[in-house]
Amino acid sequence: MGKRTPRELRLRRHNRIRKRVSGTPERPRLNVFRSHAHIYAQVIDDTVGHTLVAASTIEKGWSGSPELTKTQEAALVGKLIAERALQAGITKVVFDRGGYKYHGRVKALAEAAREAGLNF
């Protein structure tokens, strides 16, 4: 048995988290995915498997500028996902960090979403 890759380790952590974290219609799950270049956030109702709201740095018309760091872009995505969720009538969510450490871009997204009005 060889050494596991960082991706495999993250997916194992994510599976452990997903055993306990589930989104409901009253309190959907705020999921975060982080790639090397971009960050994605979705608010998901796991009972029906639907994405209710989404935001990312890859969307058309993204207002990010070249001088922003990836952490600052993540904070903008957090603010954007919170605004869209509040427009959709969602105020409470369960945060799913996706197996990533609660640090850096993931933390910036979560804190910006909290400041913009999401409760978790």
Curated annotation (Swiss-Prot):
Cross-referenced InterPro entries: Ribosomal_uL18_bac-type, Ribosomal_uL18_bac/euk
GO BP terms, alphabetized: translation
A molecular function (GO) term: structural constituent of ribosome
UniProtKB keywords: Ribonucleoprotein, Ribosomal protein, RNA-binding, rRNA-binding
SUPFAM superfamilies per the UniProt record, alphabetical: Translational machinery components
Keyword 4Fe-4S: no
Recorded coiled-coil stretches: none
Cellular component terms (Gene Ontology): cytosolic large ribosomal subunit
A Pfam family the protein falls into: Ribosomal_L18p
Signal peptide: none
Function in brief: This is one of the proteins that bind and probably mediate the attachment of the 5S RNA into the large ribosomal subunit, where it forms part of the central protuberance.
Subunit composition and interactions: Part of the 50S ribosomal subunit; part of the 5S rRNA/L5/L18/L25 subcomplex. Contacts the 5S and 23S rRNAs.
Membership in a protein family: Belongs to the universal ribosomal protein uL18 family.
UniProt cross-references to HAMAP family, sorted A to Z: Ribosomal_uL18_B
PANTHER family: 39S RIBOSOMAL PROTEIN L18, MITOCHONDRIAL, LARGE RIBOSOMAL SUBUNIT PROTEIN UL18M
Stored NCBIfam families: L18_bact
Protein name: Large ribosomal subunit protein uL18
The species this protein was found in: Chloroflexus aggregans (strain MD-66 / DSM 9485)
Gene name in the database record: rplR
